[in-house]
């Protein structure tokens, strides 16, 4: 389950591995038609993955109706990335922590199946300000270097086992 689906990288990865079902949640309704094309393309290539996309605010989803044993997502990094249809947090990082990250992480972790994995690609500040308080220290931490052009810049992927 990917509650900040973005441009579809995780959907493609799930399809490449023939994961039985990928549930993506994306607030940007403009991506609905591109996702339909992507799903058709992946089916045409032979994937057996069912891609279930929901175009809505991730905070409004009733996660108790979904069955998932894996969360793998990359959330917005405070105000570094601007996404269409995302609300603005006039109160700064604390407001975004309290009104976006904390309720979203709480809801999605609560309904993760026991024994499942909760995997977040977030910046270190979100990890330290929000994740440790809600989820405790990650069981595993991996470096995720996105590009060779960015030299020493690297992000982290944090993994919790429920």
Predicted regions span which residues?
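Class I S-adenosyl-L-methionine-dependent methyltransferase catalytic core
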Residues: 1-162
